[in-house]
Each structure stands twice: as structure tokens, then as C-alpha cells.
Design a protein with these regions (language model features):
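A short, N-terminal amphipathic alpha-helix
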Residues: 28-45, 58-60, 64-65
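Short, conserved phosphate/pyrophosphate- and ester-handling motifs at nucleotide-, phospho-/glycolipid
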Residues: 195
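Conserved core of the sugar-phosphate nucleotidyltransferase
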Residues: 105-189, 220-265
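Short phosphate-binding loop-to-helix
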Residues: 51-121
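N-terminal nucleotide-binding beta1-loop-alpha1 segment
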Residues: 1-15
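Short active-site loop/helix that positions an aromatic residue
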Residues: 200-207
Length: 265
């Protein structure tokens, strides 16, 4: 079984309530769920939110829309994933696909490509963020359930508990890790939703493309942005991996290590 787990919460320090912001009369979370469900390989989808009362909106919305939702620890997101694994009765040989709710432009075809690469290479962990070539916001991680369980058992650093797969990436000697790369380096593009400027950009994209094709493609986004470079520059002042960098600093990560993170996604 291949299960997508979408982590979502309301208490974002940089853009509060971002997962419920409106995009063409539907909240961001709905679009992330809908686009992820359009994957041909994913068989089940569960939203993983925090137990904090601020996330009651997410729980109520998921119930209303018949979306499976599990609540767990606010900061120990790895434990939240493990709780979903138990809830969904995920077996050791099953596959977990990690998606975050700040990616309303997530590409279902790309999700399938990463899953296929994971299976063909017999990998423990496969991601398109290890050597970034895709726009920030098309992030997809595919993990063997038994490996995610080991990470839950062994991860000790706060950053490894908050950033679910960091323990795996920190221990390439223990796991078969595969990087999925695109044919063109588009890693300088920012399509994630963390700042007000990100929302302005993504809203423009939806207003332009959604009415003609509700499952608009990465190519359509690129064509639109290439038609007017000023649009893509709306959020260009923000950098990749700001949240991860903050967590690593709190764990005492060196400047040299931080440079590696920002280089390798």
C-alpha cells in the first residue's frame, strides 16, 4: 500500500493560518489534498495535524470533506507521522509519501515519477529535494514504512523530530537513499507557501490557470511565469529552507553544515 501523509497546521509563525487561505474559493489544504489524490500511485491519503486547539479548523474541515485526519504532537512531527502509521495500519513493506500542506502547486505526475523511481531503485528513501532541480514547493519524499519507523525509534535531535526525514538523510550509511532530479534546474523558483509574497504569487497563478484546468500542470505554470518575469519575482526575496535552517541552528549546527543544507535542499 502507498499512503500519502500531508502534514498541516494553523500556527505558522511566518504566515498564520496559511493552509486555510483562499485559492479560487477553496482553501489551500483542499488543493493540496486534491492534487495529491490525483496521483495514480497513491492508494490512501491522511492529513496529519497537531493536537493544539488552533487546529480544530483543520479537523472540522477534514471531517466535512471526508478527508482522513489524525492529530498528534505539535513539534514532534515525526511522532505525528508514526501515529498516522498506526492509525492506518501501515505495514513495514508499505510506502509512505510525505507531502506538506504549504505546497498547493504540488504536481501529481511528479509524485508518481518519484514513487516509480523509488520502487525501481529499491530505495529506502527517495526525494526530489536532496539535489534540488524542481521549484521549491514541488517537494515529494517517498519512504519505506520500516525506515520511517526506525527514524521514529532512533532520532534524538529536535530538528530530526520536527523535520520528519532528517534522521534518514543524516545517516546515508544506514539507508539506501536516492535523489530524483529533473532534466532542467528550476530550483531557483519558489512555489511554496510560507510568506505573504508567496501567497500573492500562488494566488496569481491560480487566478490565471485554475478556471481552464483545475489540475493545471507544471508546464502551464512555467509558461505563465515565463510570459512575465515580474510575476515570478514577487517572492524572490525569500530563500529556501528557512524553517529547517532555524531548527538546525537551535541544534547547534555549524555554518559549514548550514551551507550544505542550503546547497542540497
Amino acid at each position: 500500500m502507498i499512503v500519502a501523509i500531508i502534514q498541516a497546521r494553523m500556527d505558522s509563525s511566518r504566515l498564520p493560518n496559511k493552509v486555510m487561505l483562499d485559492l479560487c474559493n477553496e482553501p489551500v489544504l483542499w488543493h493540496v489534498v486534491n492534487r495529491t489524490r490525483s496521483s495514480k500511485r497513491i492508494e490512501r491519503l491522511v492529513v496529519a495535524t497537531s493536537e493544539n486547539s488552533s487546529n480544530d479548523t483543520i479537523r472540522e474541515y477534514c471531517k466535512q470533506k471526508d478527508i482522513e485526519c489524525v492529530s498528534g504532537n505539535e513539534n514532534d512531527v515525526l511522532d505525528r507521522y508514526y501515529k498516522v502509521m498506526n492509525y492506518a495500519n501501515i505495514k513495514d513493506d508499505d510506502i509512505v509519501v510525505r507531502i506538506t500542506a504549504d505546497c498547493p502547486l504540488i504536481d501529481p505526475e511528479l509524485i508518481d515519477e518519484v514513487i516509480e523511481h523509488h520502487i525501481v531503485t529499491n530505495s529506502d528513501y527517495t526525494s526530489n529535494t536532496i539535489e534540488p532541480t524542481f521549484p521549491d514547493g514541488l517537494d515529494c519524499e517517498v519512504i519505506q514504512a520500516t525506515v520511517l519507523k526506525k527514524a521514529w525509534e532512533e532520532a534524538k535531535l529536535k530538528s530530526e523530530r520536527e523535520h520528519v526525514t532528517l534522521y534518514i538523510r543524516n545517516h546515508p550509511e544506514l539507508f539506501r537513499i536516492e535523489s530524483y532530479r529533473g532534466n532542467e534546474d528550476l530550483s531557483g523558483m519558489r512555489w511554496t507557501l510560507d510568506e505573504e509574497e508567496d501567497y500573492i504569487l500562488i494566488k496569481r497563478i491560480y487566478e490565471e490557470l485554475y478556471s481552464n484546468n483545475k489540475m493545471f500542470t507544471t508546464k502551464e505554470i512555467l509558461d505563465f511565469l515565463n510570459s512575465d518575469p515580474n510575476i515570478g519575482a514577487i517572492n524572490s526575496m525569500h530563500t529556501r529552507n528557512q524553517g529547517l535552517t532555524k531548527s538546525l541552528k537551535e541544534d547547534g549546527c555549524t555554518e559549514e553544515d548550514l551551507k550544505k543544507v542550503n546547497k542540497n535542499g
